[in-house]
Swiss-Prot record:
Name of the protein in question: T-cell surface glycoprotein CD4
Post-translational modification: Palmitoylation and association with LCK contribute to the enrichment of CD4 in lipid rafts.
Membrane topology of this protein: Single-pass type I membrane protein
Domain free text: The Ig-like V-type domain mediates the interaction with MHCII.
Side Extracellular, residues: 26-395
Domain Ig-like V-type residues, every copy: 26-125
Gene source species: Saimiri sciureus (Common squirrel monkey)
Residues carrying covalently attached carbohydrate according to the record: N254, N295, N324
GO annotation, biological process: adaptive immune response; cell adhesion; T cell differentiation; T cell selection
Modified residues (Phosphoserine): S432, S439, S455
GO cellular component: cell surface; plasma membrane
Chain's gene name: CD4
PROSITE patterns: IG_LIKE
Length: 457
């Protein structure tokens, strides 16, 4: 009797040893596609003990005993590891490198006759068509998730705009403020935060205007709104002068690793382009015939579409012709701009919302022509007005006037002589008629004539 009790105890111990290990509550881990995922496994002993990692269908992944690591024949063989530095603290994590969506499943850690289940869910967030987009293009953020999951995602742009959705988020008409880090949070029981860097390819300014006096040197600058370590592409500046009927190409160039190589350049006007970034052009002289608008384009290698910047040139000219002082501007200007002429340190003599103003008989001295917008002076030109005087009479004018006077005198004399001659002719005819009448009367009263011509009584 006494000998059977130890045997029953021994049998009970053997049966307990053959039972499966006790399973604790499942831990859920959210991981990012392409990154390292850490699955936790800990023991209360806080010391190094043997442990094993398996899949839910009992395929061995990794095991450690006496610091000796063994790897099973699984799809993770070349992507798994553990933190040896944490084993002595009773922590035996499984590290999965380059995590993939298909790695999402339940993993089992066996340690101290216990089983700890860890459910891994791997998510991916991709930007389409790319993380580098041209200004004005649309951005689509697509969430990849494990089968059977139903996550939601919320993204916040650098400008603070929030968008929410399930699998796909779209943003149209990207601008420079959208360039930067986008923070996207995936909600699937837990939260997983993605940070994705979006670069909007654009010039810092969509449009710029340069105001210059006639004859001054002009600098056009086209700084980029993004940092570029290696930039390759080609560009062109097409110009539409205000006085021209059509636009023409002023310059074309190639950009190779931030070096500028000019291909073709016009000879009129004289242009010079810088060899380094930022892209910039120099026009030797600002002349009225060059005033107008240009379209500067840059096509980047591997990108569909072009970067655009509009550039305008406004030129001011002040002239004095005889007794007229005139100020004019050429180029694209707003109807709100004010053009004024005034003596220095005095009130404006004339001020109009037009492209030309003038003053008749200007006082001698220093005059100023101002182009302003709501009181802000955009362009100023100074001019020293000379005393005005009556224009000298030209010899040709005297000759013409003398000829006209002589012609008038000759014509008057001719008319006078004709009238006088006609008057004398009429007077002679009248005297002749009187003489004839008198002659006839005398003949009729003669006696011998009367006797011959009169009939007897």
């Amino acid at each position: 009797m006494n000998g059977g009790i130890p045997f029953r105890h021994l049998l009970l111990v053997l049966q307990l040893a053959l039972l499966p290990a006790v399973t604790h509550g499942k831990t859920v881990v959210l991981g990012k596609k392409g990154e390292v995922v850490e699955l936790p496994c800990e023991t209360s002993l806080k010391k190094n003990v043997p442990f094993h990692w398996k899949t839910s269908d009992q395929i061995k992944i990794l095991g450690v005993q006496n610091y000796f690591v063994t790897r099973g024949q699984s799809k993770l063989t070349d992507r798994i590891d553990s933190k040896k530095s944490s084993w002595d603290r009773g922590s035996f994590p499984l590290l999965i490198k380059d995590a993939r969506i298909e790695d999402s499943e339940t993993y089992i850690c066996e340690v101290e006759s216990k089983k700890e289940e860890v459910e891994l869910q791997v998510f991916g967030l991709t930007a389409n068509p790319d993380t580098h987009l041209l200004q004005g293009q649309s951005l689509t953020l697509t969430l990849e998730s494990p089968p059977g999951s139903s996550p939601s995602v919320e993204c916040t742009s650098p400008r603070g705009k929030r968008i929410r959705g399930r699998k796909t988020l779209s943003v149209s008409q990207l601008g420079i403020p959208d360039s930067g880090t986008w923070k996207c949070t995936v909600f699937q029981h837990l939260e997983l935060v993605f940070e994705i860097n979006i670069v909007v390819l654009a010039f810092q300014q969509a449009s710029s205007t340069v105001y210059k006096k006639e004859g001054e040197q002009v600098e056009f600058s086209f700084p980029l709104a993004f940092a570029a370590e290696t930039l390759t592409g080609s560009g062109e500046l097409c110009w539409q002068a205000e006085r021209a009927s059509s636009s023409k190409s002023w310059i074309t160039f190639n950009l190779t690793k931030q070096e500028v190589y000019v291909k073709l350049v016009t000879q009129d006007p004289k242009l010079r382009m810088g060899k380094k970034l930022p892209l910039h052009l120099t026009l030797a002289q600002a002349l009225p015939q060059y005033a107008g608008s240009g379209n500067f384009t840059l096509a980047l290698k591997g990108k569909t579409g072009k970067l655009h910047q509009e550039v305008n040139l406004v030129v001011m000219r002040v002239t004095q012709l005889q007794n007229n002082l005139t100020c004019e501007v050429w180029g694209p200007t707003s109807p709100k701009l004010m053009l004024s002429l005034k003596l220095e340190n005095q009130e404006a003599k004339v001020s109009k919302r037009e492209k030309a103003v003038w003053v008749l008989n200007p006082e001698p001295g220093a005059w100023q022509c101002l182009l302003s917008d709501s009181g802000q002076v955009l362009l100023e030109s100074k001019f020293e007005a000379l005393p005005t005087r009556s224009p000298p009479v030209q010899p040709m004018v005297l000759i013409v006037l003398g000829g006209v006077a002589g012609l008038l005198a000759f014509t008057g004399l001719g008319i006078f002589l004709c009238v006088r001659c006609r008057h004398r002719r009429r007077q002679a005819e009248r005297m002749s008629q009187i003489k004839r009448l008198l002659s006839e009367k005398k003949t009729c009263q003669c006696p011998h004539r009367f006797q011959k011509t009169c009939s007897p009584i």
